[in-house]
Amino acid sequence: MKLHHPPADLETTKSSIEGEKRVRVLLAEDDRALRRFLEVVLERAGYEVIPASDGLEAMKLALTNEVDIVITDAMMPNLNGHELCRFLRNSQTLAHVPVILLSALEQKETDLSPEHADAFLAKPVSSETLVECIEKLLGPVSSRQ
């Protein structure tokens, strides 16, 4: 698996230091090494990351934290990514939160139903592709400052 780390963005770093509100990403991934890599990618891109090691933990964190977007692995113990998506879509307070589903299994965007994810990315996902997908769903970091 080839992974690329994005260069740190000076403007993003500067705005983070100045205390501006950053987009909060709930990241649910059971593979510890991949979760840590994705945390670094997202933090370097200017996002605040709330990590979860499985879908059940992610569900609890979504209920107790204000999140702007959820990135979840499709296959996890306790509660998989599809079940997490269904829970979010059926929640009165979380139904509006965009969800990106990550999977090592091939899936077409047309296979995504409304009660599931807003976007699908195949693993391994590059840092550029992940950030582009977030920006497509939420808008670029620079436009939110």
Where are these regions (language model features)?
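Charged docking surfaces used in two-component/phosphorelay signaling
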Residues: 36-44
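Short hydrophobic/Thr-rich beta-strand motif most characteristic of the beta2 strand and flanking loop
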Residues: 46-53, 61
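Receiver (REC) domain active-site loop signature in two-component systems and cognate sites
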Residues: 76
